[in-house]
Amino acid sequence: MTIQEIQKVDLTSFCYLNKERYPFLLESVNHNENNRYSILFAFPEKSIVLRDFSDFDFLNELESHCKQKSHDLNLPFTGGWFIYLSYELIGQIEPTLASKLQKSNIPIAYAVKIPSAVITDHKLEKTFIVDEDDDDTRINQILSDMRALENIPDETIDGEISEENEEKFTDGVKSSLDYIVAGDVFQVNLSR
């Protein structure tokens, strides 16, 4: 396990530089005790993708690939898996619900093995490179990419800001409340 402190860097820029090498970013904006870390996941390896319930048992498959490593470190990630679980995965956990779920082109569940990360601790104002296998090649690539970031120009985005008509939005809220009361849904996410 390698943990190397580095200078603070804009994690989003890594994604801009190479989205294949840096595919996932969890960024905290409420820098308090419970939301103090931003994590840029690096060097994706094997993946497990569930597209249909009948393909395989996703959670059992994931568990068979996970090795528990015990590290007494004060960081939220020291190597492991980045996992996306859709609401539809409930169809494998509670099979009676599977027939009621909508089909989609988006995977039901998706896991990617991630050996390295760049982690910013906003509370301590420190940034670290973490590599679970002490892989100098990956660590040096991250450091090289950091140097390359200095040459990325700042660009503004042209366009207009628009938002949905307020009446249409509030009608959607009312409809959602009706669905919840009727028991048709248990959660609704609305955004504007």
Where are these regions (language model features)?
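Signature of the chorismate-utilizing enzyme
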Residues: 1-192
